[in-house]
């Protein structure tokens, strides 16, 4: 059973106990009221009270005492039910704790597996980038590189924007334009890609020649293969001691980012829910 199942049972038991405690309080109040009624009857009896009236009042008192006994019987029954449910509540709380510990262990195991998988992919991408850079350097020296492989002249970028296409209209296009309007060189696919270009080669070139990589992390981003390819390339550069990745969270929660990449969730990030495009540009100016 998962923790939600036990939590629901605990909530039900706590409600049952609270209801029983209210019933006990109600019965205690009834008992107090009946005792007051008995006292009231006693105060009406004096030396002039006739035998018939006295007998009537005694029957009245007996009825109140019977009501009091009934209240006490109900209270005892409610207290017994509370004791039973309290014992069951304690058991369910222990079961909830075990379920939570089991779920936490599973989450940690899943995160560890993901980190190992990510580390393996990063190593592969790192080797790929190192090979690509070495090949580009070699072909440049031998003047054998084509204009398709490396644009001439070599262009340096301030920022490479990694994003999912679904986020272009929401944030990415406006951010790219704002950065360019503020004098930054920006690698953004709508600025750089032309018909017939090799997407992989253009991305590799942008990653290799950008000072920073802006990563627009969104629910769409974490599902894309190309964005993961770009992110792995940036992580490979960071492993060489350079701060590269600048995360911006867009319509995504910390838990979602943590499931995608624990190391990425640990980075200080801007968030489009609280930062405007102007705020983001101002923060990037201070790098």
Swiss-Prot record:
Residues 155-287 form the TIR domain. Pfam families: TIR_2. The record marks 226 as: Important for ADPR cyclization. Changing residue 226 to Y: 60% 2-cADPR produced, very little ADPR made. PROSITE patterns: TIR. One of its GO terms (molecular function) is hydrolase activity. Transmembrane segments: none annotated. It catalyses: NAD(+) = 2'cADPR + nicotinamide + H(+). One of its GO terms (biological process) is signal transduction. Its EC number is 3.2.2.-. The active site is at 230. Keywords: Hydrolase, NAD. Homodimer. NAD(+) hydrolase (NADase) that cleaves NAD(+) into nicotinamide and 2' cyclic ADP-D-ribose (2'cADPR). The TIR domain alone is active and produces cADPR (residues 134-258). It dimerizes in crystal structures. This is 2' cyclic ADP-D-ribose synthase BtTIR.
């Amino acid at each position: 059973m998962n923790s939600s199942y036990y939590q629901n049972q605990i909530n039900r038991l706590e409600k049952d106990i609270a209801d029983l405690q209210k019933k006990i309080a109600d019965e205690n109040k009834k008992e107090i009221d009946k005792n007051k009624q008995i006292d009231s009857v006693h105060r009406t009896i004096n030396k002039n009270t006739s035998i018939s009236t006295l007998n009537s009042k005694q029957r009245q008192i007996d009825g109140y005492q019977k009501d009091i006994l009934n209240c006490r019987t109900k209270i005892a029954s409610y207290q017994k039910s509370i004791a039973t449910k309290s014992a069951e509540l304690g058991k369910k709380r222990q079961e909830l704790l075990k379920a939570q510990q089991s779920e936490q262990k599973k989450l940690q195991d899943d995160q560890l597996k993901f980190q190992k998988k990510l580390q393996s992919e990063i190593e592969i991408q790192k080797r790929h980038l190192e090979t690509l850079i070495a090949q580009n350097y070699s072909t440049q020296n031998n003047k054998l590189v084509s204009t398709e492989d490396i644009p001439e002249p070599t262009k340096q970028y301030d920022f490479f924007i990694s994003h999912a296409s679904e986020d272009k209209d929401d944030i990415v296009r406006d951010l790219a334009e704002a950065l360019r309007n503020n004098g930054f060189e920006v690698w953004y696919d709508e600025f750089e890609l032309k018909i017939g270009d090799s997407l992989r080669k253009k991305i590799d070139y942008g990653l290799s020649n950008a000072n920073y990589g802006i990563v627009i992390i969104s629910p769409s981003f974490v599902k894309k293969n190309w964005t993961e390819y770009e992110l792995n390339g940036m992580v490979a550069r960071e492993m060489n001691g350079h701060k590269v990745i600048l995360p911006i969270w867009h319509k995504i929660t910390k838990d979602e980012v943590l499931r995608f990449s624990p190391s990425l969730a640990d980075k200080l990030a801007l968030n489009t829910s609280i930062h405007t495009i102007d705020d983001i540009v101002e923060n990037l100016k201070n790098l």
